[in-house]
Amino acid sequence: MPKLKTKSGVKKRFKFTASGKVKHGVAGKRHRLISHNSKYIRTNRGTSVLSEADAAHVRLWAPYGLK
């Protein structure tokens, strides 16, 4: 049986933690930030952890995990 390929979009967008949780960047931070207040920009900095329901889909698309 051939090896399963990881979806290329998943490689670019997600990382797995050591405990198996899935981290992702917060959406809506590329441009037009002048209309948002400083608190919104500050709290959406960095990464977040996906919910378990969404993480299950990502794990299907990355069969061997990501570093």
Curated annotation (Swiss-Prot):
GO MF annotations in UniProt: structural constituent of ribosome
Any one cellular-component term (Gene Ontology): cytosolic large ribosomal subunit
Keyword Transmembrane listed: no
InterPro entries assigned to the protein according to its UniProt record, in alphabetical order: Ribosomal_bL35, Ribosomal_bL35-like, Ribosomal_bL35_CS, Ribosomal_bL35_sf
Keywords: Ribonucleoprotein, Ribosomal protein
A family per Pfam: Ribosomal_L35p
GO annotation, biological process: translation
NCBIfam families: rpmI_bact
Family assignment from sequence similarity: Belongs to the bacterial ribosomal protein bL35 family.
Name this polypeptide is given: Large ribosomal subunit protein bL35
UniProt organism field: Sphingopyxis alaskensis (strain DSM 13593 / LMG 18877 / RB2256)
